[in-house]
């Protein structure tokens, strides 16, 4: 599959995956869901991802990443369209498991395909891939505007149809034969045991898990916080999510350029976590919506490139294990997104969403400490640079 279609599909995958945040109040109203029940939808995404993980452990040795991408995009498209054509809470919960099932391999497969098949361009392609995700998430806040209220299911159908059209086009429009041969050449792999035995890899992955849990909390609950506690209009609610993802998108786009100028991923990640944690901790104390939006954007911007920086850095430690590293990153994200957003809703029900967001900033500070340990251990271990 050409990189262009990997980026384009990932853009609309981001829209589909992030529909819950700006539509959650509409879903709660039409389906009579409580705050914790809507938080369960986020956890069910990760349950589907874990099921997909178990299957991928077998398939990753049998099929190429691009083949798996086509399969899981099909699963995602079917689930999205069925959400729009069916009704009932039980079926909605089941289909969210299916979305998580497809999303796991889409995320892992896209990163694995680019960092493996296009290894020589990974420092450019990986940040661009995650920029595509951020750009899609930015558009989500406005994509859903015609579908708020009782028409929220239509947004899922439209997203599914667009993904289907792009997938068909990716099979019709092929690169030149020479380019295909280069992209599809088998990638030599080594044992994954050295990766799992690396203390630095484990600590860095734990830091990423905390960040991805925090990112999911922000992406899901910042719009709800803006609407229910800051009492803002639907347009401002959508803008709050947009500011978060604009910050992420800009930093991810810049990270590719910064890396090419010789900057190292670990220091960038460390300072990003600390600044983002500070911005999130200050958010509940914002005296007006303008200051709140600035803090939201800063939170997204500072920690935004953490995922592509992680993949670029760890792939340089273990260049022949890129597919496995991509899978581990998704596992870490799955655990973080499963546990922490749900705990946030439980805390919010007994206090407030603003307080819960402030407490979740601790996750970013802890992640920063873990990255600092990895960075300092570079004096004695081979991996960190």
What role is predicted for each listed range?
Residues 20-21, 199-242:
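Extracytoplasmic gate region of multi-pass secondary transporters
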Residues 120-121, 128-175:
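Helix-loop-helix hairpin linking two adjacent transmembrane segments in secondary transporters
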Residues 45-47, 134-135, 245-246, 334-336:
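Short hydrophobic/small-residue motifs within alpha-helical transmembrane segments
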Residues 51-88:
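Conserved MFS/SLC helix-loop-helix module at the cytosolic interface between two early adjacent transmembrane helices
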Residues 95-131:
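Cytoplasmic helix-loop-helix junction between adjacent transmembrane helices
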Residues 263-310:
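C-terminal transmembrane helical hairpin of 12-TM major facilitator-type secondary transporters
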Residues 52-64, 252-264, 348:
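Helix-to-loop junctions at the C-terminal end of transmembrane segments
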Residues 32, 64, 85-90, 119, ...:
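Helix-breaking motifs and short loop linkers at transmembrane-helix boundaries and internal kinks
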């Amino acid at each position: 599959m050409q990189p262009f279609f990997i980026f384009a599909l990932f853009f609309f995958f981001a829209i589909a995956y992030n529909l819950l945040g700006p539509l959650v109040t509409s879903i709660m109203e039409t389906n009579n869901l409580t705050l914790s029940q809507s938080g369960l939808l986020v956890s069910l995404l990760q349950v589907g991802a874990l099921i997909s993980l178990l299957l991928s452990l077998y398939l990753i040795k049998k099929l190429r990443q691009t083949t798996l991408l086509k399969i899981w995009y099909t699963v995602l498209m079917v689930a999205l369209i069925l959400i729009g054509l069916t009704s009932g809470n039980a079926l909605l919960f089941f289909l969210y498991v299916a979305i998580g099932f497809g999303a796991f391999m889409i995320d892992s497969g896209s990163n694995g395909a680019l960092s493996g098949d296009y290894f020589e361009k990974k420092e450019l392609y990986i940040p661009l891939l995650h920029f595509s995700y951020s750009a899609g998430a930015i558009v989500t806040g406005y994509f859903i505007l015609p579908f708020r209220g009782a028409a929220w299911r239509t947004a899922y159908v439209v997203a599914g149809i667009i993904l289907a059209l792009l997938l068909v086009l990716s099979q019709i429009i092929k690169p030149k034969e020479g380019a295909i041969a280069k992209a599809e050449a088998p990638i030599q792999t080594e044992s994954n045991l050295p990766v799992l035995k690396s203390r630095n890899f484990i600590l860095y992955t734990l830091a990423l898990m905390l960040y991805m849990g925090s990112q999911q909390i922000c992406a899901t609950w910042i719009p709800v916080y803006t609407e229910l506690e800051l009492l803002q209009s639907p347009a401002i609610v959508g803008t709050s999510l947009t500011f978060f993802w604009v910050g992420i998108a800009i930093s991810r786009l810049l990270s590719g350029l910064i890396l090419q100028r010789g900057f190292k991923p670990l220091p960038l990640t460390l300072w990003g976590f600390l600044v983002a944690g500070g911005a999130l901790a200050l958010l509940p104390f914002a005296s007006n919506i303008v200051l709140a939006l600035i803090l939201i954007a800063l939170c997204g911007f500072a920690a935004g490139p953490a995922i592509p920086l992680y993949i670029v850095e760890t792939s340089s430690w273990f260049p022949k294990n890129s597919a496995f590293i991509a899978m581990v990153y998704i596992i870490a994200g799955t655990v973080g997104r499963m546990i922490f957003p749900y705990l946030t809703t439980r805390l919010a029900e007994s206090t407030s969403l603003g307080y819960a967001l402030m407490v979740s900033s601790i996750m970013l500070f802890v992640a920063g400490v873990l990255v600092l340990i990895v960075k300092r251990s570079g004096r004695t271990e081979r991996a960190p640079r």
